[in-house]
Amino acid sequence: MRALNDSYDVVVVGAGPAGSMASYNASKNGAKTLLIEKSQEIGTPVRCAEAVPRIEEFGINPDPSFIKSYIKGGYLIAPNGKKVVVKGGKTDGYVVERKVFDKYLAIRSGQAGTQIAVKSRVTGIEKTDDGYNVFVNYLGDEYVVKSKIVIAADGVESNIAEYAGLKSKKNPKEICSCAEYEMTNVQLLDNEMMEFYFGDICPKGYIWLFPKGDTVNVGIGVIDSKKRAIDYLDEFLSNPLVEGRLDNAVPVEFKVGGDPVGGPIEKTVDDNIIVVGDAAGHVSPLTGGGIGLSMDCGLMAGEVAAQSIKAENYSEEFLSLYEKRWKEKYYKPLMKDLKYKNILQKLSDDELNAIADSIPENLEEVDVGKLAVKIVAKAPSLLRYFKELL
């Protein structure tokens, strides 16, 4: 196996979608790049529901090797069973096999020139005059690698950002605890539609059913709950809301994970370092989804890193071009989602039912401001929650 070099232009820590896209774009634009992944197999363990937006906009073809289902929309299901159908917009996309998808993105990065080190752990970083010393345990051997730029794409449990003095969000009340079964013998309402359930059955979160070819991802995300996520999920399997459609379901895989849903971190760059993906809070606080966002921000991070190498300028001032780009595109939507999440978490089952009864059964796109007007018109008691949206 090829040993690590003494130095690189860019070292990316974490080979999830954000890290692989960042390393791909850095290499593509001429930077000597190393991608470090702690798992022995990229894409494992899977920790998410595997829904992604239309990936074509990121230059990725929807290859049959990882696309399991095409998604055209979703059902939002209130505690009383009222269904609201949402189609198009953010609900249009795919369910992928993350084990294959993540590896596909890493292979693409490797083909662009990135050196990849699997089963490798960064044990620390040390600031130098012109970058960082990165301490790596690579297949059991210890290395010290010099890098002009470090890209921290090491997920919700990010240590790299903290090593560099950048504050990451690890408040338990800002982490959504998730559990999921991949199951066969599940009867869906529609094989091209996702299902979302809300209320006391999943405190401050939601339950999802995502079609995945011959199987279905049945999962839950909860925040600051009294019981474990898996306990709520097991109770849901026999809930009348699913009308016996899970009675014969058989699990073939179990997954757990955490989503940072407190919004983006305040600062995502400093001298010689960039933070991206879950490590940066590049996740919708409302839905917990972040693969597409992380991929796009990864592309931005890799491009700016390569530009800084060409300019021989690795300062916070130069790297702030990355922060400016991602914030211009995503900061306001993320903060809106944070506001919507905070409202949703305060609603009782009766109030959720009132909302479902107040809005049309079919929506082409969700405009929260317009929906708030309709909700308050039919349920004035909810004004205290929605007045800031009117």
UniProtKB/Swiss-Prot annotation:
<feature type="binding site">
    <location>
        <position position="368"/>
    </location>
    <ligand>
        <name>a 2,3-bis-O-(geranylgeranyl)-sn-glycerol 1-phospholipid</name>
    </ligand>
</feature>
<dbReference type="GO" id="GO:0045550">
    <property type="term" value="F:geranylgeranyl reductase activity"/>
</dbReference>
<feature type="binding site">
    <location>
        <position position="49"/>
    </location>
    <ligand>
        <name>FAD</name>
    </ligand>
</feature>
<feature type="binding site">
    <location>
        <position position="51"/>
    </location>
    <ligand>
        <name>FAD</name>
    </ligand>
</feature>
<feature type="binding site">
    <location>
        <position position="37"/>
    </location>
    <ligand>
        <name>FAD</name>
    </ligand>
</feature>
<dbReference type="InterPro" id="IPR036188">
    <property type="entry name" value="FAD/NAD-bd_sf"/>
</dbReference>
<dbReference type="InterPro" id="IPR054715">
    <property type="entry name" value="GGR_cat"/>
</dbReference>
<dbReference type="Pfam" id="PF22578">
    <property type="entry name" value="GGR_cat"/>
</dbReference>
<comment type="function">
    <text>Is involved in the reduction of 2,3-digeranylgeranylglycerophospholipids (unsaturated archaeols) into 2,3-diphytanylglycerophospholipids (saturated archaeols) in the biosynthesis of archaeal membrane lipids. Catalyzes the formation of archaetidic acid (2,3-di-O-phytanyl-sn-glyceryl phosphate) from 2,3-di-O-geranylgeranylglyceryl phosphate (DGGGP) via the hydrogenation of each double bond of the isoprenoid chains.</text>
</comment>
<dbReference type="GO" id="GO:0046474">
    <property type="term" value="P:glycerophospholipid biosynthetic process"/>
</dbReference>
<feature type="binding site">
    <location>
        <position position="122"/>
    </location>
    <ligand>
        <name>FAD</name>
    </ligand>
</feature>
<comment type="pathway">
    <text>Membrane lipid metabolism; glycerophospholipid metabolism.</text>
</comment>
<dbReference type="GO" id="GO:0050660">
    <property type="term" value="F:flavin adenine dinucleotide binding"/>
</dbReference>
<keyword id="KW-0594">Phospholipid biosynthesis</keyword>
<comment type="similarity">
    <text>Belongs to the geranylgeranyl reductase family. DGGGPL reductase subfamily.</text>
</comment>
<dbReference type="InterPro" id="IPR050407">
    <property type="entry name" value="Geranylgeranyl_reductase"/>
</dbReference>
<dbReference type="GO" id="GO:0016628">
    <property type="term" value="F:oxidoreductase activity, acting on the CH-CH group of donors, NAD or NADP as acceptor"/>
</dbReference>
<feature type="binding site">
    <location>
        <position position="18"/>
    </location>
    <ligand>
        <name>FAD</name>
    </ligand>
</feature>
<dbReference type="Pfam" id="PF12831">
    <property type="entry name" value="FAD_oxidored"/>
</dbReference>
<keyword id="KW-0274">FAD</keyword>
<feature type="binding site">
    <location>
        <position position="290"/>
    </location>
    <ligand>
        <name>FAD</name>
    </ligand>
</feature>
<dbReference type="GO" id="GO:0046467">
    <property type="term" value="P:membrane lipid biosynthetic process"/>
</dbReference>
<dbReference type="InterPro" id="IPR011777">
    <property type="entry name" value="Geranylgeranyl_Rdtase_fam"/>
</dbReference>
<dbReference type="GO" id="GO:0016020">
    <property type="term" value="C:membrane"/>
</dbReference>
<keyword id="KW-1208">Phospholipid metabolism</keyword>
<feature type="binding site">
    <location>
        <position position="291"/>
    </location>
    <ligand>
        <name>FAD</name>
    </ligand>
</feature>
<feature type="binding site">
    <location>
        <position position="98"/>
    </location>
    <ligand>
        <name>FAD</name>
    </ligand>
</feature>
<dbReference type="InterPro" id="IPR023590">
    <property type="entry name" value="DGGGPL_reductase"/>
</dbReference>
<protein>
    <recommendedName>
        <fullName>Digeranylgeranylglycerophospholipid reductase</fullName>
        <ecNumber>1.3.-.-</ecNumber>
    </recommendedName>
</protein>
<feature type="binding site">
    <location>
        <position position="278"/>
    </location>
    <ligand>
        <name>FAD</name>
    </ligand>
</feature>
<keyword id="KW-0443">Lipid metabolism</keyword>
<keyword id="KW-0444">Lipid biosynthesis</keyword>
<feature type="binding site">
    <location>
        <position position="48"/>
    </location>
    <ligand>
        <name>FAD</name>
    </ligand>
</feature>
<keyword id="KW-0560">Oxidoreductase</keyword>
<keyword id="KW-0285">Flavoprotein</keyword>
